[in-house]
Each structure stands twice: as C-alpha cells, then as structure tokens.
A protein has these predicted regions:
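Transmembrane alpha-helices and adjacent helix-loop boundaries
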Residues: 1-305
Length: 305
C-alpha cells in the first residue's frame, strides 16, 4: 500500500527513490519485446539470457580493458549478440516447439557453464566488477529505448514481415506452399530478438557494479517467457505489461517476505484460467472473462441490392 501512496502522492520523490526499479522495468520490457518477436513468428526460443550475457560481458570488458566510449561498447556488444544469434539460429531453427526450447536452453547453459565460468577474463565463477557503472544515469536512455523499440516492432508486425510471421505461426506448411521463405523469416525474427536481448544486457550491465553469470541462466529464460504469457503475445504491449507486473510484484508486496512467490504463482494461474490470451489481447486491454464464458456473436450487416 505504501508503494502506491508514494507513487500518487509524490511522483517526483517516487522517481528519485525508485530509480533502479524503473530501470529494471525498462530492461525487462526490452527483454519481453525480444521474446515477443520469436513467439510472434511461431518460435518457442528461450535463448534470450544467452544473448543478454553476450551484451553485458562484451560491453563491460571493452570498457575495462580498452576504455572505449560507452556508445561504442553497446553497439559492438549488440552486433556481436546478433552475429551469435545468426550462427546459433542456423542449426536450431530447424527444430520446432519444445525441441527448439530445449536446444536454446542448451545454448544458454553451454555459454554460461562452458564459457563464462571457465574464462579468466570473465571472472570465471566469481563474476566481473564494473567500477564505471552508473545506476542512476541510465533511466532516460532505457525508457526512451523501450518506447522506440516497442513502436518499431509494432510497425514491423503491421507490414509484410509481420504478415509473414503471422502466417508461419499459424501454419508453417501452408506458408511454404504460399511461397513464403519460412527459414529466412524465422531467422530474421531470431536475430532481431538476439539484438534486443543483447541491447538489454548491455544496458543492464552498466547499471550494476557487478556482473554475475547467475543473472543469465535458465531461470531467467522462464522469467522472460512469463512476461509474454502473462501479458499476452497478440500485441507488442502485452509482454511489456507482463514484464511491468512481474517486476513490480516484489515491491508492492515486499512486506510479506517469501509469500511473494505464492502470490505471484496464484496471480499467474488466475490469468491463465480467466484470460488465457494474456492481460493484453490482440486489440489491447480487455475485460477479464473466463475462457468458457459465452461471448456475444457478431451480427453481420444485412446485404442490400
């Protein structure tokens, strides 16, 4: 309750005292949009934490060892995440559904256990210190980035690319028969998703004085997927709303300790039961109604002439 009182009674004070929370909402919103892209194109990929780790570690390492400008660090980190996304996508995008999910989880764990935990340059299991972090200075960049990314992705879904993704999601075989280059369009979605996850990782790393491999594991994959399931994948704002809710829950109910996990689970189950398409439908926010509740049938206009 104190959380909402502070929000509405003193917005400026709330902003100043919850800067890290606002930043995390923005980061999670970008990750949720990354997940939206692959789900919208019919791919159950859980690779986002791997690309996020690439963005985080590359940007911080460039800053530590080469002292290059922040913008250059982020650009290089994002591009490298995209290149790795393309290379990973070549074999794994031949898979579908659960098999694709398992393969991308394998990529995340292979990167974390096989690379990050075994290279001295990444701090091995001890993590990586980031003395040049700026926890308070990145909020405007993060929020503006989220708005711009959401708008651009929304525009993509309304164009030729979005139509192809939608067709592939509904019926991949039928899409092939219609002349749609399924492999190409799936790769585009996968690489764009990798770029966004890498960007989120680079932004997130420069908010923290310590980069830890534990932030890029399978649990993070499940969390990002939860953003999409909770908010809905029919509209780009859905996963962002889901990310906002999941990020806020621990702060809103911080006085109840470990029971927050129980409340979060109950809330997620309730949404799945009463709003299986997510909080945000294809056309935006809608009334919560059980999936079995009768819906009014559309009445067609009488034909004339």
């Amino acid at each position: 309750m104190d959380f909402f009182i502070s929000l509405f009674s003193d917005p400026v004070g709330f902003w100043n005292s919850h800067t890290l929370l606002i930043s995390q909402i923005g980061i999670n919103g970008i990750l949720a949009t990354s997940m939206f892209l692959v789900l919208y194109s019919g791919q159950l990929s859980l690779a986002a934490p791997g690309f996020m780790a690439i963005g985080a570690y590359v940007s911080v390492l460039m800053d530590l060892y080469w002292h290059t400008p922040y913008v250059l660090n982020v650009v290089v980190a994002v591009l490298l995440a995209g290149v790795v996304g393309f290379l990973v996508g070549l074999p794994v995008l031949r898979l579908r559904g659960v098999f694709l999910a398992i393969a991308t989880i394998g990529f995340v764990e292979a990167l974390r256990l096989g690379v990050i935990l075994n290279l001295p340059i990444t701090g091995e299991g001890l993590g990586l210190k980031n003395p040049n972090a700026d926890p308070l200075g990145g909020v405007p960049v993060i929020l503006v980035s989220l708005v711009v990314i959401a708008f651009l992705v929304w525009r993509l879904t309304k164009g030729r690319l979005g139509n192809a993704w939608s067709a592939i999601r509904q019926d991949e075989i039928a899409s092939l028969s219609q002349g749609i280059f399924v492999a190409r369009y799936k790769m585009v979605a996968f690489v764009l998703s990798a770029l966004l996850a890498g960007y989120a990782g680079a932004l997130d790393a420069h908010l923290n004085f310590f980069v830890d491999q534990g932030s890029y594991d399978v649990a993070r994959s499940v969390q990002i997927l939860t953003f999409a399931v909770l908010g809905g994948t029919g509209f780009v704002l859905g996963p962002i709303v889901g990310a906002t809710i999941v990020t806020l829950l621990p702060y809103v109910f911080q006085g109840i300790g470990d029971y927050i996990n129980v409340i979060s689970g109950i809330f997620l189950i309730a949404v799945i039961v009463f709003r299986p398409q997510g909080i945000v439908g294809r056309g935006g926010l809608a009334l919560v109604r059980p999936s079995w509740w009768p819906r009014a049938r559309a009445v067609s206009a009488p034909q004339t002439g």
